[in-house]
């Protein structure tokens, strides 16, 4: 069950020569990979992505069942890169699909471990195993195990939760980790201001999309990829009546329809691909239908930014476009043309989840943030 290291970045310096009390192991489990990195304070020692054979992971029924498998992969990687376990000060992992949480750090405690091992999961997702792996490695070392800005961050103001159907209140789920990290980075490095005194709208552009409104450090409102603009493979906001009719048309099972709206929708449904680069090649080849759909993608996502700007009466310090698809100048240019009248726009392309996790853990180690306590009475 040995994992294959697909890519390893050069070390910043020799890890064995660095000592201190701020060495952080970062773990980010994905469906087909485990990404990890080791930082000494804010200096990255190394990072790698361990690719997993899907035939191996398919043997596990639930995400939490992969605990020993993922732990072994991480320990082997540390050994290969000459990182002694006793040199670690903290372990931080991407958080899973927990009940609604605040932004920031949470200690991995007994309640959290009971929850991810229970039948009460909000959603079965591989990120659910991350906290358990962090705890399993940290406990014998007597060091903190944390999660940070979990997928289930929910700090919505009361008005944002209310919909026209009381049984269907709005939920907050999306790319809280990357978007909040980019907002903090923009505040500190570009505006030279305290993140907790700024207002940002951040659009994450990946396979999934989500748009976040951060005011004074809190995520007070947001759009996920099922209630705003569509994405490369997500449906976005749909009219209710036709959707209800489609549900009862007999054309789809519940599972098929769920896959349609989250995985087979958006660019993929219209053009047969969710790869923005491929769509740009189609347009360059003269495909006018692709040009229209790609234009509509930016148009629909820009509307979500405009919606959130009204919540704060247009008083926005910066709009930020981030995520892998933000590398597309055509897409970001389209969005910017619609929203730059609201506030200046920063394109911060790519995903910085490992850095965001490490930075959050470092703030905890330095006493700049206090971790929350997860409580579950199930």
Q: Which positions does each model-derived feature cover?
A:
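Phosphate/pyrophosphate-binding loops at sites that engage ATP/ADP/AMP, CoA/4′-phosphopantetheine
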Residues: 76-89, 189-194, 304-317
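Adenine-nucleotide phosphate-binding core of ATP-dependent small-molecule kinases
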Residues: 259-314
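Glycine-rich phosphate-binding/hydrolytic loop that grips phosphoryl groups
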Residues: 326-327, 333, 346-378
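N-terminal phosphate-binding loop and adjacent alpha-helix
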Residues: 48-86, 112, 118-122
């Amino acid at each position: 069950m040995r994992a294959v290291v697909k890519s390893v970045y050069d070390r910043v310096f020799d890890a064995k020569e660095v000592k201190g009390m701020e060495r952080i192991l970062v773990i980010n489990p994905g469906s087909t990979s485990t990404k990890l990195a080791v930082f000494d304070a804010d200096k990255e020692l190394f990072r790698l992505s361990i690719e997993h054979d899907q035939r191996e992971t398919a043997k596990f029924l639930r995400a939490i069942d992969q605990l020993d498998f993922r732990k072994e992969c991480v320990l082997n990687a540390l050994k290969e890169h000459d990182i002694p376990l006793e040199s670690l000060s903290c372990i931080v992992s991407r958080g899973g699909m927990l009940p609604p949480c605040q932004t920031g750090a949470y200690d991995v405690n007994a309640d959290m471990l009971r929850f991810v091992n229970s039948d009460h999961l909000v959603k079965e997702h591989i990120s659910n195993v991350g906290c358990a792996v962090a705890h399993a490695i940290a406990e014998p070392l007597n060091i903190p195990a944390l999660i940070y800005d979990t997928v289930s961050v929910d700090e919505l103001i009361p008005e944002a939760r209310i919909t026209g159907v009381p049984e269907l209140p709005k939920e907050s789920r999306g790319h809280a980790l990357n978007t909040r990290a980019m907002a903090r980075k923009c505040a500190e490095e570009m505006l030279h201001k305290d993140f907790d005194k700024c207002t940002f709208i951040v659009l994450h552009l990946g396979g999934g999309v989500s748009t976040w409104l951060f005011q004074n450090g809190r995520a007070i409102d947001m759009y996920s990829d099922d209630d705003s603009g569509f994405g490369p493979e997500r449906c976005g906001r749909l009219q209710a009546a036709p959707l209800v009719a489609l549900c009862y048309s007999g054309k789809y099972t519940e599972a098929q329809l769920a896959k349609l709206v989250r995985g087979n929708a958006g660019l993929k449904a219209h053009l047969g691909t969710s790869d923005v680069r491929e769509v740009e090649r189609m347009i360059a080849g003269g495909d006018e239908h692709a040009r229209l759909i790609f234009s509509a993608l930016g148009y629909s996502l820009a509307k979500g930014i405009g919606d959130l700007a009204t919540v704060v009466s247009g008083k926005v310090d910066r709009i930020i476009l981030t995520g892998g698809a933000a590398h597309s100048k055509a897409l970001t240019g389209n969005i910017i043309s619609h929203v730059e009248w609201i506030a200046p726009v920063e394109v911060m392309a790519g995903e910085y989840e490992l850095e965001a996790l490490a930075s959050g853990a470092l703030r905890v180690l330095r006493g700049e943030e206090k971790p929350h306590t997860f409580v579950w009475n199930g």
